[in-house]
Amino acid sequence: MTNSSSSASPTPATSSSPSGSDRLGLTLKLLGWAVLGLLPLYAWTVSTAPIDSVQGMMQKILYVHPPLAYGAYLGFVATAIAGGLFLWQGREVHDQLAIAGAEVGTLFCTLMLITGPIWARGAWGPGNWWVWDARLTLTLLLWFVYLAYMLLRSFTEGDERAARFSSIYGILGVVLIPLNYWIIDLVGGAMHPDNLEFEEESSSLGVGMGLPFFVGNLTLFFVFIYLLVLRWRVGMLRTEAERAEFDSRRN
């Protein structure tokens, strides 16, 4: 993960105060307990879910793949919102949240790009590892966009102008998310069902498949929030340490 922060903040006492990182620490503990409670339930519901008569065991990736997509989208939206707040207020806490959103979102997007082809190959045969489906292609583009964001932050650490440029970049990049959602309805897809079809299939899963699908979404949502807050807190603690070191040298 990148180790980047902007060099200046108009309100350092507010944006990087120890009490702020302490609150994030408490939130992190609560989220950790929630994740620990949900993971066994998630594993149990997936393992006991009925096996699909057509796709077999590969169908169980349904309980992982869509939740990963939602996590990726949430991460990139968090980057855009936090970037907008940073441009408005110039506070380090928002810049660190933007970085955290991009990194965790890219992690989820990477796992989504891995699980999707595995599912396709298992369901439709060896020739379907990768098909240039419209949504799949846009997802790959989305991955490259936020990978570039992280590389930019890595190579421009401590540059406030780069932080502001990255904020604008993150806001523009998030436009790909609604496009990614609607692209199947606009041009169709070779692998993904259209949105109405997916919603109808999801609502008609029944208890056997519907419960693990719901628990999977809930669990990976909490995993996403946990990782987001963890990375956010690490960034804030690093910023506080750097500021304290700078103050000690100045004094």
Feature names for model-found ranges:
Residues T2-N251:
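Polytopic transmembrane helical bundles with strong interfacial aromatic enrichment
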